[in-house]
């Protein structure tokens, strides 16, 4: 397969997922798997969409809905792996899942790893 080079402004034509660099460079996040970090980037992308769509709770917190099926498709992984990555992020404190019951998908709150008061990465 022969791929071509990027020329001029062609490199700006694609949409990208953002994964915070600090998840890879700060020792406090070293125990999060690479796939968990990638999932966090996907969840962050959804936060921006949810905010645009007005998915905000009564406390002003943005939430997302990202089903296991959607995670499996986005990450090309099994259900067991998708659950593992979500659980890893939840146990680390980077997300909070609120189960709605009655077959509805969970609400996911993606937490900000920056301590706004001190403008530094929070200690987890």
Predicted feature residues:
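Charged low-complexity intrinsically disordered patches
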Residues: 2, 114-124
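Compositionally biased, low-complexity repeat tracts
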Residues: 4, 32, 97-99, 123
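Winged helix-turn-helix DNA-binding recognition segment
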Residues: 46-110
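Low-complexity, intrinsically disordered short peptide segments enriched in small/polar/basic residues
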Residues: 16, 35, 92, 107, ...
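Short recognition helix of helix-turn-helix/winged-helix DNA-binding domains
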Residues: 1-69, 73
């Amino acid at each position: 397969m022969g791929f071509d080079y990027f020329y001029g402004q062609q490199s700006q034509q694609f949409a990208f997922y953002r994964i915070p660099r600090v998840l890879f460079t700060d020792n406090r996040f070293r125990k999060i798997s690479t796939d968990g970090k990638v999932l966090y980037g996907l969840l962050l992308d959804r936060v921006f969409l949810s905010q645009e769509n007005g998915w905000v709770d009564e406390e002003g917190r943005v939430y997302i809905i990202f089903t296991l099926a959607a995670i499996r498709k986005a990450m090309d992984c099994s259900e067991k792996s998708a659950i593992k990555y979500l659980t890893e992020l939840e146990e680390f404190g980077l997300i909070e899942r609120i189960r709605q019951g009655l077959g509805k998908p969970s609400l996911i709150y993606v937490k900000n790893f920056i301590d706004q008061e001190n403008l530094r990465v929070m200690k987890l």
